[in-house]
Structure formats: structure tokens, C-alpha cells
UniProtKB/Swiss-Prot annotation:
Keywords: Calcium channel impairing toxin, Disulfide bond, Ion channel impairing toxin, Knottin, Neurotoxin, Secreted, Toxin, Voltage-gated calcium channel impairing toxin. This is Omega-theraphotoxin-Asp3a. The keyword Disulfide bond applies. It holds the Pfam family Toxin_22. The presence of a 'disulfide through disulfide knottin' structurally defines this protein as a knottin. InterPro entries: Toxin_22. One of its GO terms (cellular component) is extracellular region. It comes from Aphonopelma sp.
Amino acid sequence: CLGENVPCDKDRPNCCSKYECLEPTGYGRCYASYYSYKKKTL
């Protein structure tokens, strides 16, 4: 488990259960990979 705000692979998500792998803001221009973010609890 890597934690929050670290690069992750959306095809092989190894984020913890409380995190999800999402495109960061500026993906493709500033960032080349997905990052793990805290899941928004509803």
C-alpha cells in the first residue's frame, strides 16, 4: 500500500481500499500517470 498522492497504475490498482486511482488535474500536460486520491465518502 503506497498511500495518498502517489503514482498508480489504473490497470493494476495497488492503492489501499480507502484510496482510488484517478487522473490528476492537468493529466497529459503536467502529469503522465494516474495518482491515488482519498475516496470521497458519501
